[in-house]
Amino acid sequence: MVKGQSLQDPFLNALRRERVPVSIYLVNGIKLQGQIESFDQFVILLKNTVSQMVYKHAISTVVPSRPVSHHSNNPGGSNNYHGSNTTAQQQSQEADDAE
């Protein structure tokens, strides 16, 4: 496994497994919403009313609608919690205001 994916894969897998609604912000500022249906090394399959294949290199931020826990590969198997943070919420609000 590539070292950079040791956090990414468990996080995306928890979002997929728990069917957590997510907002995905692209590097060009576009906001996509849906549930992660599947993913691999290069793409995320995002499902809403339709399925969209989103290339990871185009993604800036993935924001879950609620906190998600996943087990990391850290010694001792400690839990890591990820949820919406203030910066992501501000970005979301600014994007909504701009529309």
From Swiss-Prot:
Top-rank lineage group of the source organism: Bacteria
Biological processes annotated in GO: regulation of DNA-templated transcription; regulation of RNA stability; regulation of translation, ncRNA-mediated
One Gene Ontology MF term: RNA binding
InterPro entries linked to this entry: Hfq, LSM_dom_sf, Sm
UniProt keywords, alphabetically: RNA-binding, Stress response
Stretches the record annotates as Disordered: 64-99
Single GO cellular component term: cytosol
Compositional bias ranges of the Low complexity kind: 70-93
Domain Sm: 9-68
Matching Pfam families: Hfq (PF17209)
Family of the protein in this entry: Belongs to the Hfq family.
Function noted in UniProt: RNA chaperone that binds small regulatory RNA (sRNAs) and mRNAs to facilitate mRNA translational regulation in response to envelope stress, environmental stress and changes in metabolite concentrations. Also binds with high specificity to tRNAs. Involved in the regulation of the bacteriocin carotovoricin.
UniProt xrefs under PANTHER family: RNA-BINDING PROTEIN HFQ (PTHR34772:SF1)
Subunit structure of this chain's protein: Homohexamer.
NCBIfam families reported in the protein's UniProt record: Hfq, PRK00395.1
Entry protein name: RNA-binding protein Hfq
Source species: Pectobacterium carotovorum subsp. carotovorum
